Every structure is written in structure tokens, then in C-alpha cells.
């Protein structure tokens, strides 16, 4: 009788372990820099990754009608072309740090999610500030 209970518990634990760890490997999303990706392109081809770096100045092209954003992401050493379908975040600009989630396909990173890195410091407007002063403060923070 004890043997059947022990065997049942082991089967249940084995099944739970397989579901947890088996699914974990398929759902991992790696964070890479352009240099790390270019060192091992085959490993990450058609796999979901997060690519982090800076938007290279002079490379941003945005088609407002089609909602297509193209730019080059760099880590100062390597560069990767990025395509993102959708409206860019409000703080998106050249030279800005970004993280793009997506997949590499045919040499271009196809972004599905675009996040802008920004300072974690928050300074609320002081009483009596004019809208122009608040706008200037926001622009300086970016």
C-alpha cells in the first residue's frame, strides 16, 4: 500500500517538474546587446529576445500613415537594424536608450514591443509653475 502511494507521489512530482522546467526553456526571453547577438546569430535566429542599446542618431525613419518605425540600434560597438510596427513611445528619440522585444528575421530585428529607458527620478511641478516651465523641466529630463 505504501509503495503505491509513494509511486503516485513520484509520478505527480515528476509531471509537475516536467511542466515547470519543460515550459520554462521554451518561454525564456534573452536580453542581448547588438554585439552579443552578432557573436552568436544562429543561436537567436527566430527566437524571442530583448535587444537593448541606443538609437543611433540619423537613422530614425517613421511612416505615420503605415505606423512603421525603422532605426538602427547600437551598443557603441555593433549595430542592428530594427523594424517596429506601431506608434513609438512619447519619449522615443535619437540617442535614447531603448529595449526592443521581438525576433531576428533575415538580418532585421522585427520588434513587437518597444520600451524607452528613462531616469527613475521624478520631480513634481512646484506650485505656481507655468505650463512653459513644466514643459521645459520635462524636456530637460529627457
From Swiss-Prot:
Coiled coil: none annotated. It comes from the Bacteria. Residues 24-142 are periplasmic. The chain crosses the membrane at residues 3-23. GO terms for molecular function: heme binding; metal ion binding. Keywords: Cell inner membrane, Cell membrane, Cytochrome c-type biogenesis, Heme, Iron, Membrane, Metal-binding, Signal-anchor, Transmembrane, Transmembrane helix. The keyword Lipid biosynthesis does not apply. It is a single-pass type II membrane protein. This is Cytochrome c-type biogenesis protein CcmE. It comes from Thermus thermophilus (strain ATCC 27634 / DSM 579 / HB8).
